[in-house]
Amino acid sequence: MLAIAALGIVAGRAQTPPPQSHVRAVTITILSTNLAEEGRGEWGFAALVEADGHKILFDTGTYPDTVLSNALEMKIDLSGISQVVLSHSDDDHTGGLLNLRRELSKANTAALSRAYVAKGFFYERMASPNEKAEDRIALLKAEYKRTGGTFLENDRPVALYPGIWLLGPIPRIHPEQNWSGSGKVKTPRGLAEDNIPEDTSLVLDTDRGLIVLSGCCHAGIINTIEYAREKVRSAPIYAAIGGFHLMRASDATLDWTAQKLKEFGLSNFIGAHCTGIEPVYRIRQKAGLSRRTCIVGGVGDRFSMEKGIIAGLLTH
């Protein structure tokens, strides 16, 4: 049985959930991404996860009010959600956190009061070894604490609910190199290239296979899926949803990625945010998917166990 652990940064440890079981009902709704048929688009990502009566907000978009505005337009009430997952520390995934916490807590003091991140989220960043470290994340941590929020930093996979896993830091077995910057990060071992070591993904274990939800997948989609299959369950990939940072990938890299996804039994793919547009179409072709099972994700697009991909006119 996989060990379950979470390191509380502000207070306490994550509670050990009941024994693992398959998630039976899942709906994932995109609340922030580049394309929008309804609501507002932005360079960022956020999604609402609803699974067996539980709700989790995954990432919070770039601008303070985008996710809240889009949710209101879609008549989605986020105030009942206490758990938020931040896939990594970039501001296009964390930018909405404070405003969401402040606004939603007016209706429910527990709204978005527990933020899950992976180890490395709070590492100091700098553009070069001689420059002063950025304080953006330190400020975010302090401001979130002032709202009554708690950060929970995980150094390994943790079950948030039965069958719903946050992977923690993901080993970089394949050289996918899915990051853009040339900055540096201060780690316990010293100054290193900032390859976004805290990048993490959410995994839902269903009886049809695993659903993988990523913000940017800086660890690499194949590294992420292989780690999920190792630590959660060696099962087919029922769906991969989110940003996968393939926008600059070569055709050879995309073909390799698509072949691996095909080997993993990928059934559904929604590539949003930094995935790019052409990469989605190439994966559709090379992985043997269709217009119904592989789309460029837009604001308001959904995936459910019952109906599969529910796309708007823009992304269908």
Question: Language-model segments: which ranges?
Answer:
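Active-site-proximal loop/helix segments of hydrolase catalytic cores
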Residues: 178-181, 187-236, 242-245
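Metallo-beta-lactamase
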Residues: 120-200, 295-306, 312
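Binuclear metal-ion centers of metallo-dependent hydrolases, dominated by the metallo-beta-lactamase
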Residues: 148-153, 260-316
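Pre-active-site segment of Zn-dependent metallo-hydrolases
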Residues: 38-40, 54-83, 106, 178, ...
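Active-site neighborhood of phospho(di)ester-bond hydrolases with catalytic His/Asp-centered motifs
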Residues: 57-61, 82-89, 116-118, 212-216, ...
